Amino acid sequence: MDFPDKMDLENERVLKLIFPDGVPDNLRGNPELDNYLAKLGTCKVEQLKKEQTRLAEEARTILEQTQDLAISNYRTFITTAENSRSIFSEFLRSEQQLDTLVSKLPDLSVQCERFLQDSAELNEQRRLNSITLQKNAQLLEVLELPQLMERCIREGRYEEALELAAYATRLGQHQGHIPVVTSIVRSVEALWHNMLVQLVAQLRTDLQLPKCLQIVGYLRRMQAFGDNELRLKFLQARDAWLTSCLEAIPTADAQQHLSKTIEITRINLFNIITQYRAIFPEDEGTLKTQSSLRPLQGVSCNGDRLFQAWLHNKISDFLQTLERDLQLGVGSVETVLGQCMYFGLSFSRVGADFRALMAPIFVGVIRRRFESSVEQVDEQFERELERFTLINKVALHSHARKQVDPEQESYAPPEALLDFYPLAALCNGYLSALNELRLCAPLALATDVTRCLQHSLQQAAQRVLAFYRQEQQAFAGSEREAFVRLCSCLAYDLVPYIQRCIHGVFPPQSLTVHLGISLLQLEQQQLTYLQQTRILEPLKHLLPTKALVQPQDKVMEAKPSAGVPVTAEG
């Protein structure tokens, strides 16, 4: 059934009848209009006829009531109107304020967000401050790490200092983004470097092996140097200490300086070698295997070679000091030689026997000292010969030269030299030089000593000849005879005696054993034998005719330590 639609259609028809010009706007959609139309639909015809009159009457009544109400409530209406106007004004002002508020709401939102952020930060800071207050003791320990480490280093507690440095390193790895932690780590690193310098500086002092082991152990734990670098640092530091000890020795007295240098170098250098080998032990088998498998790759810093080079350098420095002090002059070369040989022998225990390197130095020094002594003897002989005179020279000693039994041969100088003071002074000078040489006479100098004396005797003969040429015009018979005796004493007393003294210092038997030749070969090669012919060549026309008797081979074999003088019978 379509009743609702049909009713709507009827209502529209009724409305057209009531409002031919259309329904007023104020009644459109009014539910009372619909209710009134529904009520009209229920009225009878008589009621419909009276409805218009009723409505007019009702309208008139309502109008009267409204007028009465307006008259009775006039003031109320005025007040209401004023209030309405006031309310309207307030609403307008409120609308303006709301518009202003709406325009400022974004800024307010931003400020609120900022306030919330600041509040959150303040809250976080307050929370951190609370945690800081609770963890105050632990934070103080962290903040005092640099001071604590500095105190440990100052007091020598390096074990604790290393633990603090390791803790600071771990702290920096985990909390490195915190500025305070970064500052603490930097301070600890600076103190770590100071400790490294202090440990290396301690190696430059007098240390025993346990202390050296401890210090190098700390350096290894610090991992500041590689193995070869650590070896180099150790040798440099110990070398600086050894050098300071040597530089502290007074240099005024060469003998004392050299003795102290030998003692200090021997003791301290041996200690350094012992310390090095204890700290850096070498596995020879491993080293040989590595060296055999490793190809050549340019220059490398091998620890063992580094130590050998350093030891070679120290020995070279000692040899330079030895040579310099010996050249300055020492009182007792044999004492220094004994100390040096003991020094070199003691180092054979560590495979560094360097006695062979000292031998040429001593040989050279002894040779120069002997040559210097002989030169002084030559100068003295020249001065004495210039003051010498043959006037009233009487032979006080016999000039007969006896055949001496080799078994009872003596090294006493010939008494005939006493008649001629220059020859006696020359002989005494030779004896002084040979006696000084005898205390420390290297076999390597046998030829040099013989050559030096040969040259000196040749110069003596030349000076005697010059003396003859200068004075011969004024010679009387007795003076000429005295000069012949002087020449004979030089040729047949002094020269054979010096030859015997040479063999006393350098026994032929010792030379034959050293050279691996026989006595006959030694004589044939003229080793340690003076060449009398060359010595006496300038004076041969002034010497009396003598028959020379050479020693027999059996005599030389019976007494190799005796000289083989060139003697003359009669």
From Swiss-Prot:
Annotated source species: Drosophila melanogaster (Fruit fly)
GO BP field: intra-Golgi vesicle-mediated transport; protein transport
Subunit structure: Component of the conserved oligomeric Golgi complex which is composed of eight different subunits and is required for normal Golgi morphology and localization.
Family classification: Belongs to the COG8 family.
GO (cellular component) term, any one: Golgi transport complex
Function: Required for normal Golgi function.
Topology of the protein relative to the lipid bilayer: Peripheral membrane protein
Major location category of this protein: Golgi
Keywords from the named record: Golgi apparatus, Membrane, Protein transport, Transport
Descriptive protein name: Conserved oligomeric Golgi complex subunit 8
Localization, UniProt: Golgi apparatus membrane
